[in-house]
Amino acid sequence: MRHYPVMLNEVIENLSLKENSIVIDATLGAAGHSSFILKQIKKGFLIAFDQDKDEIDKSIETLSQIGNNFSVINSNFAEMKDKVKELGYEKVDAILFDLGTSSMQMDDITRGFNYHEEAILDMRMDRRTKLTAKDIVNTYSKEELLRILKEYSDEKFRLPIVNNILKYREKKEIETTIELAEIIKS
């Protein structure tokens, strides 16, 4: 299934690319944006980051059909500065961040992001990491869960949600996406 990037024309226009631009795509995903960037920078270089090895393999194949002036790094963009220097670049011309969970990750129930279908709670962007959403909801303290919801969401009902999680896990471990969704809704 072909992936169509969101707001492609606006993104390309606002990056103000030149043929020799050095560009970072901090969140490669299915290479939707990067494919179009690579077509614009024939004498430049694209450096793309992603944590999701499944997507990286497909994206390299896609980008290779356009050119070879790119490098894909299986890493979180938090390591961008060091990784870009390792490639020999001191500065870049543009950086794209397309943040969030991809539709491919949501559609793949084995990833544990989709709360419309029964699946094991996983929610890891990088499957090499050990910590899953199941681990977090079942072992983190009330304070830790509240902190996560405060820092990473705009959830105004975080206290009742956390209290529901704590109450539920007294009886049984939370294992699936549907269980968690029902706990949150209750």
Task: State the predicted function of each range.
Residues 1-186:
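S-adenosyl-L-methionine-dependent methyltransferase catalytic core, i.e., the SAM/SAH-binding region
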